[in-house]
Amino acid sequence: GTDLPLCAEGRAQLEELKAKFQYPDVPLVFCSPMLRAQQTAEVLFPNAKLTILQDLREMNFGKFENRPITELVKDPEFAQWMDPTSRTNPDGAEDRKAFYDRTNVMLMKLFEYQLRTHTEEAACITHGGVIMNMMANHVLPQHKPEEWMTDPGCGYSLRLDAEMWMRDHIAEAFDIVPYGYLDGAEE
């Protein structure tokens, strides 16, 4: 995907979230190599060790990069590519199955690293498509990928039980990050 920096508006939104709500105090942040993800990590977790992982990058949209979603939803070729039953792969775009496999393997590696090193808390800064895919495939409660969509600067706290992970490759989502973000919000 296109490696754009965090825009001034995005940085201001993150600063506002950090001022209003609580982010967990974690020693380690796994992060996408994309510049905007690294800059997000610097704002939200300035004291954490940053570990850049290539497989946390967003899907490469190829010829659809940098086009507004309002335009893309009207494009029949984009709709066909997004259809889960389609094997269409537009020019320059990452194959959806390759993306699915890459992000699922990455989550497994992250969790196995945490279990092996006894890392009790860590954050992961990545992108919407990566989050939705990982959560839909390895997290309870089960939801469709689009139901795991988060607002910018937000995410989920997961509970990783070693036995459940080793047996089922499943973790449990138990809260929204930042803490307090949904308090008083209508569901």
Give residue ranges: language-model regions:
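Generic beta-sheet signal
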Residues: 27, 118-128
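Generic structural signal for well-ordered alpha-helical scaffold segments
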Residues: 15-19, 100, 104-115
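Active-site catalytic microenvironments for nucleophilic, acid-base chemistry
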Residues: 20, 43, 47, 109, ...
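Acidic, low-complexity terminal tails and accessory targeting/binding regions
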Residues: 59-70, 112-120, 135-187
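Short, active-site-adjacent cap segments at secondary-structure transitions
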Residues: 36-38, 58-59, 130-132
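Active-site-proximal alpha-helix that buttresses catalytic centers in soluble enzyme cores
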Residues: 1-48
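Short beta-strand scaffold positions
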Residues: 31-32, 101, 125-126
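Phosphate-handling substructures
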Residues: 4-5, 44-102
